[in-house]
Every structure is written in C-alpha cells, then in structure tokens.
Amino acid sequence: MMRSHYCGQLNESLEGQEVTLCGWVHRRRDHGGVIFLDIRDREGLAQVVFDPDRAETFAAADRVRSEYVVKITGKVRLRPAGAGNANMASGMIEVLGYELEVLNEAETPPFPLNEYSDVGEETRLRYRFIDLRRPEMAEKLRLRSRMTTSIRRYLDENGFLDVETPILTRATPEGARDYLVPSRTHAGSFFALPQSPQLFKQLLMVAGFDRYYQIAKCFRDEDLRADRQPEFTQIDIETSFLDEKDIMGLTEGMIRNLFKEVLGLEFGEFPHMTFEEAMRRYGSDKPDLRNPLELVDVADQLKEVEFKVFSGPANDPKCRIAALRVPGGASMPRKQIDDYTKFVGIYGAKGLAYIKVNERAKGVEGLQSPIVKNIPEANLNVILDRVGAVDGDIVFFGADKAKIVSEALGALRIKLGHDLNLLTCEWAPMWVVDFPMFEENDDGSFTALHHPFTAPKCSPEELEANPATALSRAYDMVLNGTELGGGSIRIHRKEMQQAVFRLLGISEAEQEEKFGFLLDALKYGAPPHGGLAFGLDRLVMLMTGAQSIREVIAFPKTQSAACVMTQAPGLVDAKALRELHIRLREQPKAE
C-alpha cells in the first residue's frame, strides 16, 4: 500500500510515529522559509511542514502547486502552542515531511477548491470530478455510504434477503413516463427501465422470499424539481405474513437506528395521523410538524352572511373555508400580505382574506380588515376564539373548492413557518395512514392515489359500490414535511386486483396484456404481503442538510435531465440505429 494513514485519521495519539500520506495539495503556504502544505484526501486534511534542512525535499515542496497529487512521508508531531486548528480533525498535530514524491501534476482547476465561492452549478457539474474533491462534498458521499451500510446491516439482522430485480423490463402504467430501450433482437419492441421494482418484489413474495430488500436504481422520465432526478435510488422493502403495524414498526426501527448510528440522534415513537386529519389541520398529506400553525374550519360560522365570497363556499359540500392564525402577524406590512396573496394564487386561490387582530377588547373596532363589515360580530368572535387569536395576530382565510383551500393554505403555512422562523424543533418524523383508495377526476373517472396494487380496507363488492369513499391500507413516513417513504399492504387475491383494474378503466384485454403475469401469479397461492420504499437520495439530502438531491448524488443530471460532464444524452450513429430498426423522422439539429 502506498499510504499508511488517511489525512483525516491523524491525531495526537500518533505523535512521534512515521506516516505516509497520499493525496492532493489543498493549499500551499511559504512562511519565512518554511513551507506548509495542506494535504487532502477523502477523509480530511493534514498539515505537512517542510524545513530547509532537507534541501532536496524542501525544493520539491517549493515546486508543487494546488491539486498536485503527492506522496509524503514524515513524522507526526504536536503543533506549537496556540497554533492548533479546532476546525480540523487533525488540527492539533502536523507532519514534519522528509520525503515527497509528486505522483502527478495538475493544471489550475476551473474553480478554486480551498476558497469555494459562487461557482455556477453547471460549471460544478461539468467538472464534477473536481467538485467532489471539496471536503463538504466528500463528506456527503461518505455519510451516504455510512447510511447504506447501516440500512443493510439492520435489514440483514432482521432476516431480509438482498435480491436484485431486472433493469430491462416492460412498460407498465405507473404514473410517470418510462425510459424506453429499443430491442435489437425483437424488431419494433422496447424494454422499459423500471420506475420501481414493484411487481417483481410482489412476485418474489409469491415465490416464498418473505423478507426482501434491495437498494435499487429506478428511472422516471418526468419534469424535474429540486427533489427529483430521472434516475434515483430507492430502499425497496417487501414482506409476507406481516400487517401494516408490523411493517411500519420494522421500517420505523430502521430509520430510528439509522439516525442514531449516523447522526447520534434518538427519536421516540413516531406519531400516527390519518390522511383526513392531516389535510384538515395542515392542508398536506405530508405535514411538517415542526411548524405550529394549523388550519381551522370555520364554514359553519359563515353560512348566513351576505358576503357571497364566504356564504357560497360555506354552503357547498365540495368547498371549504379555513382560517390560519399567525401569531404576531398583525404587524405584517401590506406588501407582504400582497406577496402572500400572489403566492396562494399559484395553487388556484382567487384571493387571501385576512383579519389583523389589534385589540380584541374593542370588538370590531379593534380588528383591521376589509371583510369584518360583512360578518356579524358574534360570528367573528366565535371564529377568533376557535383559532385562538389574541392581540397582535393576523388570521388568513381561504374559501374555495376544498382541494384548492387545503393546498393553498397548506403551502402558505409552510412558507410562513420558514419566513417567520416559527419551526419549533429540528426533526419531526410521523406516519400518515388511511389514505383514500382513489382520487376522483373531473370527468368522474378514478386514479389510484398510490398505485393500482394497493389493497383497500373493504371487499371487492364494497369497493366497486363506493369507490369514492374507500380507504386503502397505505402508509407514508414523513419527516419535516418531506415524504421519506410510502408503502401499503398489497392486493394478493386475483378478484380484488381485477376489481381495482376495472375501477381504473383498465379493460380485461389491457389487464391481460400488461399485467397477465401478475394475475397469473395471484392464482397460485399468493401470500398476504406488503412493503415500503424509501427515497435514499431524499433521505441523504435531509440528513446532510443539502438543498437539493443533486448535492448528494455523485454524478447527477441537471434539471433538464442531461449530464453536462459526459454530454449525455448524445447522438448515435446511423449504423446503430439501423441495427435497432429505428429511423429518425427528423434529423437532430446541431447545437
């Protein structure tokens, strides 16, 4: 081995020992005839000192520059009093270097690593192999590795088998667009890259592998946001002969163990909340419980008012009127309220009514709002009491279709929590349960809220009679307002699966064409089973405090689903296209 230690492993216990380090020159300093090199590797930094007494080595140190790859041998010693650096793991020691070998020189990098500033993300991604040298980036990938090690260990100890499922499979309707791979040997046919291992892991349950896991690559050709990538990594879990409580207990234990091992944090039991309660109180099926703000229904107090903006929705069973109290918000300037009004407009809200509570003891005179004249004082007092309003607060109102009100005020709640620094703790894990089985579309058709293999809490006959009110056996784990993972008990009887397909408008012919292998499997003794999948990238993002999952993936794609480093996707030559039986209708334009 070329090295004896990593730079970040050096400490006072090695005083007097000879060590050999290999790494990159992070910084070079010449102080009064003594040369200092900060050497960097994946584990951290170490300071190496070269003095003129060893002329040949000193001359070599004088020639090196930033990012040269070097091998250095020297003796560990304590730094002089007052010269320690508490910000470095090796900050109390230094290495007196007496051998230096330049393993490779380096051109000046496209951006400085030791004084990292506002470098554009495209430049960072184009030179990702340079960007990943930065200690903060290396630390994120090290933590990611520790996380997957912890997860594997936990699942192994709990009897799970790591089984790989195919990457080349067939297209199935799972919500997003598939990435397609043309077949050379089957002209005109295409493989699809998996959006998840969902069907294969269910088939593994039918095959008798009752505890499966896989850290799986998944692919979705969808519009990208800060927490999306076209290829992403999933912690995929499936079990047989366990119910919801068992699966949630196992996977909650995995996450609690993960945070304890990796971050030293201990969580108590995760609270459970129904989908209905989450939407009613927080306007979201993934509420951030660090935020103390809550939505409160007030439609019952506004049914008789002459103000149609309120009385209309108050008397419509498909609508909702909710209030959101913001402590201390009465001092909010009009411009800020206008900005929040524009913000809720993104979610379809037509406006944002408000009441500033200046002095409740003065009755209506102590309230500042364009709407108070339209609401009887008795009703106003009930509303203000219900939301807990006190002097100095502001109360916002949403009145519209229930979905619009929940989404708009739910998003406003999150924004206010961050804008006004209202978060009460650092971590708030929870479970959301009892999701609706389906989402009803405007045309009366149904879409599966999770996926079409989720089991309902009723019989096939009850499901087909009342699909709009059916609840599923689904559960989501949420952390700080982010869905960490979602899962469910699956359908394990053929007649139930066919009933769900019928409600989703999937004909028998289409069922057979796209899911025939699954329906076949369900005929041959499929056990009760269920599972859950966590987004690993998202989990790493939360645990490292990164702003985007691109920060925690070694070689991510841009928001336009491209790799600027390798210039992927790229053109292929005509011969390759002919072999794949593909002809382009339009020739791509040169960029």
UniProtKB/Swiss-Prot annotation:
Keywords: Aminoacyl-tRNA synthetase, ATP-binding, Cytoplasm, Ligase, Nucleotide-binding, Protein biosynthesis. Signal peptide: none annotated. It is found in: Cytoplasm. CDD domains: AspRS_core, EcAspRS_like_N. One of its GO terms (cellular component) is cytoplasm. Residues 198-201 are annotated as: Aspartate. One of its GO terms (molecular function) is aspartate-tRNA ligase activity. InterPro entries: Aa-tRNA-synt_II (IPR004364), aa-tRNA-synth_II (IPR006195), aa-tRNA-synth_II/BPL/LPL (IPR045864), Asp-tRNA-ligase_1 (IPR004524), Asp-tRNA-ligase_1_N (IPR047089), Asp/Asn-tRNA-synth_IIb (IPR002312), AspRS_core (IPR047090), GAD-like_sf (IPR004115). L-aspartate binds at E174, R220, H450, R490. It catalyses: tRNA(Asx) + L-aspartate + ATP = L-aspartyl-tRNA(Asx) + AMP + diphosphate. Its EC number is 6.1.1.23. Gene3D superfamilies: Bira Bifunctional Protein, Domain 2 (3.30.930.10), GAD-like domain (3.30.1360.30), Nucleic acid-binding proteins (2.40.50.140). GO terms for biological process: aspartyl-tRNA aminoacylation. Its main location: cytoplasm. The record marks H31, G82 as: Important for tRNA non-discrimination. ATP binds at R220, D221, E222, Q229, E483, G535, L536, D537, R538. Pfam families: GAD, tRNA-synt_2, tRNA_anti-codon. Belongs to the class-II aminoacyl-tRNA synthetase family. Type 1 subfamily. NCBIfam families: aspS_bact, PRK00476.1. Homodimer. Aspartyl-tRNA synthetase with relaxed tRNA specificity since it is able to aspartylate not only its cognate tRNA(Asp) but also tRNA(Asn). Reaction proceeds in two steps: L-aspartate is first activated by ATP to form Asp-AMP and then transferred to the acceptor end of tRNA(Asp/Asn). This is Aspartate--tRNA(Asp/Asn) ligase. The gene is aspS.
